[in-house]
Amino acid sequence: MDERFNKEFEQLALPLLDPLYNFACWLSGNPDEARDLVQETFVKALKAFASFQAGTNFRAWMFRILRNTFLTSRTGLERRNTSQQDEDGYDEAVVSYDTPELAIMRQADTELVQASIARLSPVFQEVLLLADIEEMKYQEVAETLAIPIGTVMSRLARARKQVREHIVDALGKKS
């Protein structure tokens, strides 16, 4: 492969590194596995880059490769819904200038939303994560998942409704 080819791939792919990693974390539930998925995605994409059609949606193409890589790597395995913790048993901390009370409330909110998303079926999770977390347009989500745009919209509506219901239910139980 020539250098121009590699530079073109780099320019298109590197800005997607963080969004792909975030999506891989959500899919796998494991930061180490997510890093492996992203690395494998980049290798596969670089090998197939010559077949990528200029003018089509590169972002959707990369997310589709990542998703397919995840699905083939997980064949026959049950997905783990546990969060990966560091060696001390604590989730990695985020530097914050909030008061301790606000930080605790924000962490509780984040955990509730994450738990609500984790309860969704994988087809609803994928659509919700791509549309709402990765901020993809409906058409991009449809291209990434190889489903009609109407299916994206209906799955997204159902996913949002289920998340909302779970949060309302969880908050109602705490009162």
Question: What spans do the regions from the language model cover?
Answer:
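Short, aromatic/basic-enriched loop-to-helix "N-cap" motif that marks the start
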Residues: 18, 50-64, 149
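A short, charge-rich alpha-helical start-of-domain segment used by transcription regulators
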Residues: 1-22, 32-35, 46
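Sigma70-family region 2
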Residues: 2, 40-57, 76-78
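Helix-turn-helix DNA-binding module
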Residues: 118, 122-126, 131-151, 165
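C-terminal edge and immediately downstream basic/flexible tail or linker adjoining helix-turn-helix-like DNA-binding
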Residues: 2-9, 82, 106, 139, ...
